Structure formats: C-alpha cells, structure tokens
A protein has these predicted regions:
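A long, amphipathic alpha-helix that forms part
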Residues: 6-20, 27-68, 213-215
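Structural motif
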Residues: 19-23, 69, 155, 192
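Short catalytic/ligand-binding loop motif for oxyanion handling, primarily in non-cytosolic enzymes
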Residues: 29-32, 77-80, 85, 164-166, ...
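Histidine-centered active-site/metal-ligand motif
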Residues: 32-34, 74, 175-181
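Active-site metal-binding loops of divalent metal-dependent hydrolases
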Residues: 72-75, 160
Length: 226
C-alpha cells in the first residue's frame, strides 16, 4: 500500500498525468479483524483522509483543475455464527467431480450439477440451512447471471453474519466478513466526490468502472489537440 501511495504522489506531481487510480487495502484487513472497533477503524480513516488531502493539494499545484473521488467496494458484517455446509453435502451419496462440483466461499456455496439428479439431493440437503438459493432474478439484479455459469450454476447464500466453516477460504471464522446480500445494511459501500455525479449515477459497485471510464473519456476530449 505504501508503494501505491508513493506512486500516486509521484503521478500527482507530474504535469503530464491526467488520471490516477489509487488502490488501498489496509482498511479491508482491519475491518476483517476489528469490525465495530471505532477507535482502530477511525485511526485508519483519518490516515486515509490526510493522504487524500495531501494528494489533492499536490495535484492542485501541478494542474489547473483537480477533482477527487473516493469509493469503497463493499462493507463489513460482524460474525454471528458458523455453518458447516460441506458436511451436509458430504453426507449425500454423491461423488464430487462426477455427480456435482462445488466451491465453498466464506458466505456462499457455488454448485455445478454434473448429473441431473444431484440438484434435487443437494437442494434437499440444504433445505434447513440458514440462507437461500439465489433466484435467477436476483442473479440478474446482482449482475452475476452469466450464461456459461462460470461462477456457479446455483448459489446458496448464507444469512448475513454467518460464515461457512470450514470453507475453501478458511478453517476458522473472521470477526468480520463481506460477500452477503448487497441489500443488507452492512454490505453498503460508499462514494465521496468533490465533483457532482449527476452525469453518471452510481447505484452499485459495477458502476464505479463506468464512472472512471466516463471521466477518462472526458479527459481525452478535453486534452485532444485541435
């Protein structure tokens, strides 16, 4: 992260730089371990705020016009409990890689049904599990209705705050986790900008890409030689 910040400072001081994308990940790690600890998280937010102010001032000294947009890609949900979905599936008379395939993430289980009968058995096995199968409409709303089912033919999403343990991600739960229903209040992301966003409404995380693309296209038009 320090290397990213140093590169951003160097770019901000370069008059030929027109767009900077700065990625930081320290806050994500802190929230996984210290979700709900306002003192710990507050100190990191203050540090980021200071970095943003310094970057903005530095860029303003070397450019006529400067705008700054800060956004996050997800929230963080406190741990409420764990669920062993894999154990429920392993009890079935099904062969992994022959009848079905599965990937156990921290908050969801993704399934591919290699034999038609496997779907009914797996669905029944998780009937009492705390969560729900994502509907096709939900997948479309969330932007994950991929026709090739690359990321799951069917996805079982846990209720907010629960974690699959053990999973393909971890053997022990973390105090905080993300990857739940984006409509849950702890899943909300954030966006702050010195420039109005009326020309590019941001409704979900995927819109951040469109926003950056739009700003880059605008810069290209503004700097295009006559």
């Amino acid at each position: 992260e320090e290397a990213n910040l140093a590169a951003a400072r160097a770019s901000a001081a370069d008059p030929d730089t027109s767009f900077i994308f700065l990625y930081t990940a320290k806050l994500d790690g802190l929230l996984h371990q210290h979700v709900g600890d306002d003192a710990v998280i507050g100190r990191q937010l203050d540090a980021y705020a200071q970095e943003c102010r310094e970057l903005f001032r530095l860029a303003a000294r070397h450019h006529d016009q400067v705008s700054l947009t800060v956004f996050s890609d997800h929230g963080m949900t406190p741990l409420k409990g764990t669920v062993d979905l894999k154990a429920d599936i392993d009890k079935l008379n099904l062969r992994f890689g022959v009848d079905y395939s599965a990937c156990y993430d921290s908050t969801m289980a993704r399934f591919w049904f290699l034999k038609p009968a496997a779907q009914a058995d797996i669905t029944a096995a998780l009937a009492q599990a705390p969560g729900h199968w994502l509907s096709q409409e939900e997948m479309r709303q969330f932007g994950i209705a991929f026709p090739d089912h690359k990321f799951g033919e069917a996805i079982f999403l846990l209720d907010s705050g629960l974690q699959i343990i053990p999973s393909d991600m971890a053997l022990k739960p973390l105090p905080g986790m993300h990857g739940y229903d984006p409509r849950d209040r702890d899943s909300h992301a954030a966006i702050l900008s010195t420039r109005p966003l009326d020309d590019c409404q941001v409704r979900d995380v995927a819109d951040f890409f469109h926003l950056m693309r739009k700003r880059i296209d605008q810069l290209k038009k503004h700097t295009r030689p006559n």
